[in-house]
């Protein structure tokens, strides 16, 4: 039953029009995030030359805030998109950030800009150490897009996307909690390639070069 539903989710997120709608909605909504709104306000008051600034040129703190906002958008956009698919009973799991319940089965949703990993959290170690039902996205970011083109809808922050729907996935966890960092990296072993390559909806896995151990995420 679960494998049938997982494949139904994959089929849904493999439809070009659905993927295009997801990217479009993310691009429209991210233009409203606090960082971009602040830049527009500051430009309107003549205290910044933001129209000449590319996304790549934002400082690390501002970029991180954009990506955090994008992650929360992703959870909502995918959950609502899934609710439109006939045969899916979808609800938000309010007990755990990022979780969606589809036909009584819990799935985790995460997005990343990393080459081969998603960000986990040490408070979720038990869940992430077990096999997870996981919808994983990588954003293909247009780094050289001008910030004001994003704000004005001339060009989207996201140009491409990777979507995978992974059933009972066992991640490799890297990193541990420190006084200043409670985050860990969730990676997919090269050994799992034959299994997970069939679970990609949009984009591809890339096999790492030079004896790399973890699969790389390639948006399309």
Stretch-by-stretch model annotation:
Residues 1-101, 111-220:
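Nucleic-acid endonuclease domains
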Residues 106-108:
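Short hydrophobic-acidic sequence motifs that mark active-site Asp/Glu residues
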């Amino acid at each position: 039953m679960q494998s049938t539903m997982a494949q139904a989710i994959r089929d849904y997120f493999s439809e070009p029009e659905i993927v295009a709608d997801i990217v479009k909605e993310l691009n429209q909504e991210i233009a409203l995030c606090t960082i971009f709104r602040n830049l527009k306000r500051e430009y309107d008051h003549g205290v910044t030359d933001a129209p000449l600034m590319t996304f790549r040129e934002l400082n690390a703190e501002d970029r991180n805030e954009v990506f955090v906002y994008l992650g929360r958008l992703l959870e909502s956009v995918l959950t609502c998109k899934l609710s439109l698919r006939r045969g899916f009973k979808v609800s938000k799991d309010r007990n755990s950030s990022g979780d969606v319940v589809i036909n009584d089965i819990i799935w985790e949703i995460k997005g990343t800009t990393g080459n081969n990993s998603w960000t986990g959290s040490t408070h979720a170690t038990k869940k992430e150490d077990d096999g997870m039902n996981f919808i994983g996205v990588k954003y293909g970011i247009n780094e050289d897009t001008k910030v004001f083109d994003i704000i004005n809808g001339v060009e989207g922050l996201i140009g491409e996307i990777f979507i995978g729907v992974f059933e009972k996935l066992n991640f490799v966890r890297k990193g541990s909690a420190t006084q200043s960092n409670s985050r860990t990296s969730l990676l997919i072993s090269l050994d799992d390639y034959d299994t997970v390559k069939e679970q990609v909806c949009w984009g591809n896995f890339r096999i790492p070069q030079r004896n790399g151990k973890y699969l790389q995420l390639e948006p399309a």
